[in-house]
Amino acid sequence: MPLFSDRKSAAPDHMPPPSLPLLALELRAPWEFGAVLPAWPVLQRAPLGDGHTVIVFPGLTAGDTTTVPLRRYLESRNYNTLGWGQGLNLGPREGVLENAKAQLQQAADASGNKVSLVGWSLGGIYARELAKEMPERVRCVVTLGTPFS
């Protein structure tokens, strides 16, 4: 049974892990971060948010540390941000989705409002799955570089 859905996946039953060259593409992150610096004045003119909570989910092999720049930016625009709090995102494994559901429930209860979910790459798959399973707790989903099918 698939971890995320009752539907049969169109993917093959077994997919090998990504190759080392493909995994090494993630090393481009510091250069991409540097590319944001010239855009910073424009980003600072973005409208302010309403203070609602946003949970940010990292991509594969990343953790909350890698989402700090994004979360700090969102905080500067008046959002209350949370990391996913589960260490490195090592892909679908037992307990991850259940922990994310509990975090979403707790964040929504604490704020009294729906929560926005931002997912980066694989984190976007978790965000979409949470929205599918708990739509009454989710305000919106934003995905960044997330695969879809």
Annotated model-derived regions:
Residues 1-54, 67, 72, 77, ...:
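Flexible, membrane-associating and regulatory peripheral segments of lipid-active enzymes
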